[in-house]
Amino acid sequence: MDVERWTPDLIPLAKRGQIEAIGVSNHNLAEIKRAGEILAEEGLKISAVQNHFSLLHCSSEKAGILDYCKENGITFCAYMVLEQGALTGHFDTDHPFPEGTGRGEAYNPHLEELAALIQELHSIGAVHQASPAQVATAWAIAKGTLPIIGVTKVRQVEEAAAAAQIVLSDEEVSRLEKLGDEAGVDTLREWEKEME
């Protein structure tokens, strides 16, 4: 990202009221801080950071981005929280993604490695009367993020909203994170970078 080039271009738009808030996506901590410095010189600030964040991809947390956002009043919007459906509990080795699709190519080779995590999402969901997708979403909320959830059905909207009411225990969060790490599945896409 060329923060030095694009950030100044946003300043006149913000000052004229043509944009209400400024956010960045797929930026590491150094880039976020530098964009913030440039904006601060003009009395502006970053309002949101949007990065890939899920039980399988936590590099924004490990890099200190989540903490930085909390400390500076920046909303962290987590995308791919459900890993394009891989963490919904709907897919496993017996029920893979359709062959020949991007999701099938990305996740089908790893469904076995994801089995323990998916089982834990089901188990925790049973305790909270929630689906695995709701548990994965509740985890992202527990980490202080605002999850971006892709939906195609009204039921999915209702389930996503209900996830905000689920309060996971520290022990549940820890179990999920341990299994996410142990799965060892790299879900980074070609347009993304590691944040660490």
Model regions and ranges:
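Beta/alpha (TIM)-barrel catalytic core signal, keyed to glycine-rich beta->alpha loops juxtaposed to Asp/Glu
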Residues: M1-E196
